[in-house]
Amino acid sequence: MGYLKGFALYISILILIVFIAGCGKSDKTKEDSKEAQIKKSFEKTLDMYPIKNLEDLYDKEGYRDGEFKKGDKGTWTLLTSFAKSNKPGEIDDEGMVLFLNRNIKKATGYYYTSKVHDEFNEKEHQKKYHVELKNNKIVLLDNVEDSKLKNKIENFKFFSQYADFRDFKNYKNGNISSADNVPSFDAEYQISNTDKNVKKLREVYPITTKKSPVLKLHIDGDIKGSSIGYKNIEFNFSKVKDEETAVRDFVNFGPSDGVS
């Protein structure tokens, strides 16, 4: 799907992930174990939600491994995006990426808008608006004449700032899948429209479908932890062609080198 390719580009991860269902009904015990591992991998991150003051991350340590250089305190990368098909063959995608460098206690990033087309020969039309974080507020660095867009950027909130996953341990019997050729894992859960996170997303974004979403937990990399891979969550409200609607959230901790 074109949107997935675009999402990978925005977070500077140039890896094509092929999702292949890896666990059958005849291997129920193994599937249950994999679900427990996926949930355990997400627990430390989701326990941080809601991160009401993003600047608290300057003092928050994350998973460290040999990829970190000596003395590097690491950088937190946040992304929240909303994708929706508003016309046939086209998906409007917008969101914000923020890099919080713990070494210099500075956070910079950008808000982006993009149109992803189905046609093979059409490229994405993307615009970026640079921002920084000061006193837990988004400060727009570029001149934006569109007052509606300007207000949207300056008042942007990451999903991780208002999400609440205190009931996460109660999520059970997910649809588990993994890839055979790369370390890639997914757990999907059908979520009710009465869920507090779903209600909040419907308040924040123009989600027109009344369908209840599927929550997907995705891991790219070692399921036990890795600073090279990443984890993201997705609320998928519709996968129907020309009705695609999804919200993605990404909170990652990694080496500061190469992050900008």
UniProtKB/Swiss-Prot annotation:
It comes from the Bacteria. Pfam families: DUF576 (PF04507). A lipid is attached at residue 23 (N-palmitoyl cysteine). InterPro entries: Csa, Csa_sf. It is found in: Cell membrane. One of its GO terms (cellular component) is plasma membrane. It is a lipid-anchor. Keywords: Cell membrane, Lipoprotein, Membrane, Palmitate, Signal. Residues 1-22 form the signal peptide. Its main location: membrane. A lipid is attached at residue 23 (S-diacylglycerol cysteine). Belongs to the staphylococcal tandem lipoprotein family. This is Uncharacterized lipoprotein SAS0399.
